[in-house]
């Protein structure tokens, strides 16, 4: 006869004979429980003809000494097995490690193919491990806040005193749709969106704190299939392992609400490179996250500096190294400079001079063309995937990203404007699964045709037609790029207080424009120290004015990173250098500059500066030699010609009418920046341009 057994592990079918003993029957029932599921406590096993406590429950030990025919079962009966899980052995190892990106699914017992087991969710980690996820400080801050939107007493509708409250003045939820519409907030903030998801759960339910509300989108085929009922893809596929169809809509929230540039000089640095070369530039944004008060529970990114990677600029594009080789080192130096400082995004130029007026830029990104091209969107999504956001609100321990993208492009007035955006969470999933590609038309994205051994799910996009009805359209072969990103506002502070005060040191990776070198460091530091009669090698004799000038000179992101990467300072001294560069922003760190002056690396640098200054002093010609080399009298010694004022003889001398060559063969004035070069090279020490013009 056929009997059905329903247990917490699922439903199974057993074929037994009337003469089957109770012991064999009990063993067959236990075999329906997969080995990967929690095993039952033998003392709690019971069999019933009704679920729960409604029917007659028979303990397992009562089956001993009997046969199936004696138990009164009929063909097709449904029996209910109940038990309590056995307590876990504390010495046993966990079944799945939290760090495993693709946990192996539990395989059902092949001897019972009809046993049904719920497959585990792909790319998940046990909930108990989410407590170890380290969230950013801004997320920890907003989790502790109520997020309510406070309202004042309405004099027109409120009929109560100052200490009372009614429907017209009570605080609103951060996701209130009416407030969002009145203040023209297109996207909810990340934490307001979380509050909206959690608001649908009962406040007393434990799931409100145990089950993460966010579910990362996965568009890849799960291999191997969690059911184990067929070979892995591409040899087999089922509804469990294949991804669901995708319906694209405008993302209702954004991870970052605003981008604030700490100083206009950050943007000016990129623009100056484009103005001098005419080629495009890209840089990574160095900044930190902070609260943004203009939207409920908002988050903004404050950009303090940029780092330009190795690249080759072109008139209409650029080539940049991938992956970015110096990222880990730059991240480390940024962390030393200020708490929370890290790589937060990227910025690049897309500027073209107007053919009618080269002093203006071409306006090519607008509502009738595109804001961000499909290729740019795929690039943004790829960088966001490499910079995920750590959060306990997702079963995987991370969700989307706060990596932002900015573009400097022409505006309608011929000036330069900043466009900022983020790729949506769906865009990240589609790029990760490799189902989209860039198009020749920058305003649309192509859905890839699946190749051999590939699976591309159905993709749709939804919009409102001219009648106000929601319409769903297939996205193959193309769909608008607007479905893959959210716009971000940007601006500058009214009272700038940048973390880095100087930008005099050359920017990295600009060969031919201006190069970084120790000679530039020595020249700039010597120019500050020579304004005082104090001894260069003894920082203790420097007046307060000189120390302040040195501190401001050190507060340069490009200078700090250059010195840290030169090997002149030890690891501990590099940390002191970063502290000294940002000491003005940390009033409690008053001894950072003195610690730097006392370090061995700084003393070595001063020794080099001192020896360079001494060598220059010995090589400088007398005051009148410049006039003698030009064949004219010195204004200080104008009068009858004397033997001492005669032009020096030798190959370096230049007579009157012979032309003005390099002064004494050493000093040469740069025709570009007018700096007097005292070396015999062919390029200027400051601007790096040829001295021959």
From Swiss-Prot:
Family annotation (Pfam families): NPL4, zf-NPL4
Annotated Polar residues bias: 615-631
InterPro entries per record: MPN, Npl4, NPL4_C, NPL4_Zn-bd_put
Any one Gene Ontology molecular-function term assigned to this protein's record: ubiquitin protein ligase binding
One GO process term, biological-process aspect: mRNA transport
GO cellular component, one term: perinuclear region of cytoplasm
Disulfide bonds: none
Protein location: Cytoplasm, Perinuclear region; Endoplasmic reticulum membrane; Nucleus membrane
Domain of life: Eukaryota
Family matches, as PROSITE patterns: MPN
Chain residue ranges for the region called Disordered: 85-132, 615-662
Domain MPN: start-end pairs: 259-399
Topological relation to the membrane, as annotated: Peripheral membrane protein
Keywords, comma-separated and alphabetical: Cytoplasm, Endoplasmic reticulum, Membrane, mRNA transport, Nucleus, Protein transport, Translocation, Transport
Biased composition regions of type Low complexity, renumbered to the chain: 644-655
Biological role stated in the UniProt entry: Involved in the import of nuclear-targeted proteins into the nucleus and the export of poly(A) RNA out of the nucleus. Has a role in the endoplasmic reticulum-associated degradation (ERAD) pathway.
Family the UniProt entry places it in: Belongs to the NPL4 family.
PANTHER family (UniProt xref): NUCLEAR PROTEIN LOCALIZATION 4 (PTHR12710), NUCLEAR PROTEIN LOCALIZATION PROTEIN 4 HOMOLOG (PTHR12710:SF0)
The name this protein goes by in its record: Nuclear protein localization protein 4
């Amino acid at each position: 006869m056929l009997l059905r057994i329903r247990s917490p592990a699922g439903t199974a079918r057993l074929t037994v004979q009337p003469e089957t003993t109770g012991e064999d029957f009990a063993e067959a029932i236990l075999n329906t429980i997969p080995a990967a599921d929690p095993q039952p406590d033998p003392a709690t096993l019971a069999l019933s003809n009704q679920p729960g406590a409604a029917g007659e429950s028979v303990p397992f030990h009562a089956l001993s000494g009997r046969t199936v025919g004696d138990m009164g079962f009929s063909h097709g009966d449904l029996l209910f097995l109940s038990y309590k899980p056995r307590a876990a052995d504390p010495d046993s190892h966990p079944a799945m490690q939290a760090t495993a990106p693709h946990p192996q699914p539990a395989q059902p017992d092949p001897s019972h193919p009809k046993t049904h087991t719920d497959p585990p969710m792909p790319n998940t980690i046990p909930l108990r491990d989410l407590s170890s996820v380290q969230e950013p400080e801004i997320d920890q801050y907003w989790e502790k806040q109520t997020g309510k939107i406070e309202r004042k007493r309405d004099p027109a509708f409120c009929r109560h005193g100052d200490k009372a409250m009614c429907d017209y003045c009570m605080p609103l939820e951060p996701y209130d749709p009416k407030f969002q519409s009145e203040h023209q907030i297109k996207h909810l903030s990340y934490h307001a969106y979380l509050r909206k998801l959690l608001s649908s759960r009962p406040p007393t339910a434990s799931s409100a704190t145990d089950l993460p509300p966010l579910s990362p989108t996965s568009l890849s085929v799960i291999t191997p299939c969690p059911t184990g009922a067929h070979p892995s893809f591409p040899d087999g596929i089922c509804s469990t392992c294949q991804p669901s169809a995708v319906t694209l809509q405008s993302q209702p929230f954004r991870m970052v609400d605003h981008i604030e540039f700490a100083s206009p000089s950050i943007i000016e640095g990129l623009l100056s490179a484009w103005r001098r070369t005419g080629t495009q530039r890209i840089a990574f944004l160095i900044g930190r996250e902070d609260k943004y008060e203009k939207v409920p529970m908002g988050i903004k990114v404050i950009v303090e500096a940029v780092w330009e990677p190795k690249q080759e600029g072109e008139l209409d594009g650029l080539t940049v190294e991938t992956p970015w080789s110096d990222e880990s080192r730059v991240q480390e130096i940024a962390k030393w400079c200020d708490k929370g400082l890290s790589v937060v995004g990227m910025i690049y130029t897309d500027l073209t001079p107007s053919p009618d007026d080269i002093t203006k830029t071409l306006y090519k990104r607008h509502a009738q063309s595109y804001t961000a091209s499909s290729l740019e969107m795929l690039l943004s999504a790829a960088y966001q995937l490499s910079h995920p956001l750590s959060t306990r609100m997702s079963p995987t321990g991370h969700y989307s990203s706060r990596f932002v993208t900015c573009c400097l492009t022409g505006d309608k007035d011929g000036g330069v404007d900043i466009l900022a955006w983020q790729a949506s969470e769906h865009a990240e999933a589609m790029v990760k699964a490799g189902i989209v590609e860039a198009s020749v038309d920058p305003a649309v994205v192509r859905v890839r045709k699946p190749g051999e051994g590939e699976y591309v799910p159905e993709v749709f996009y939804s919009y409102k037609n001219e009648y106000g009805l929601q319409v769903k359209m297939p996205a193959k072969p193309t769909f608008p790029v607007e479905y893959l990103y959210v716009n971000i506002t940007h601006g500058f502070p009214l009272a700038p207080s940048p973390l880095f005060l100087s930008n005099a040191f050359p920017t990295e990776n600009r060969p031919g424009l201006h190069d970084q070198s120790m000679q530039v460091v020595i020249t700039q530091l010597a120019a500050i120290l020579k304004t005082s009669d104090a001894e260069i090698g003894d920082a203790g004799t420097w007046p307060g004015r000189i120390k302040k000038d040195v501190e401001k000179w050190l507060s340069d992101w490009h200078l700090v990173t250059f010195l840290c990467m030169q090997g002149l300072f030890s690891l501990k001294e590099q940390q002191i250098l970063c502290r000294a560069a940002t000491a003005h922003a940390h009033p409690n760190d008053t001894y950072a500059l003195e610690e730097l002056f006392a370090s061995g690396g700084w003393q070595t640098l001063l020794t080099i500066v001192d020896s360079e200054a001494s060598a220059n002093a010995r090589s400088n010609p007398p005051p009148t030699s410049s006039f003698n080399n030009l064949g004219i009298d010195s204004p200080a010694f104008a009068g009858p010609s004397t033997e001492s004022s005669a032009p020096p003889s030798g190959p370096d001398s230049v007579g009157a009418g012979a032309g003005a060559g390099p002064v004494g063969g050493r000093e040469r004035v740069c025709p570009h920046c007018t700096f007097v070069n005292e070396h015999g090279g062919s390029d200027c020490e400051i601007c790096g341009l040829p001295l021959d013009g």
